[in-house]
Amino acid sequence: MLDHAGKVRKLDGSEGDAAKIEAWRAGVTQLAKLPHVHIKLSMLGFLVPGWTDDAAKEAIVIGLVKELLELFGPSRCMFASNWHGSGASSNADYCDECQPTMTELYEKFQAWCDGPLGLDAEAQALVFAGTAEAFYRI
């Protein structure tokens, strides 16, 4: 299980992001070729601190999540909050303010699924529960 969306770190929309994203993309592309590798779509603030307060940063997160869904497919991606390890936050990497709440995160991710991620009901069922149920055998 690959956590935190593959751990590309502290993107902010600057020129330096391109090299980080290319290195991340090369790694996750290779990992996605391995059928037993799954990925958690978690700790989004670890990737892009402040994404909840900045539309441009949120767009970066959406793009990364969309790319992971395309690489791994919904059956190997799972929504995760990193609760309780990071408290009630997904934007905390111990450098940021702890937000959003779990409810806000879920609502935001759901809106992405219905909107820019374009996931149908079957794909959403996998990302929000089915993938975890299968992976963890619950």
For each feature predicted by the language model, list its residue ranges:
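Histidine-centered active-site/metal-ligand motif
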Residues: 4
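H/E-rich (His + Asp/Glu) clusters that bind or coordinate divalent metals
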Residues: 9-138
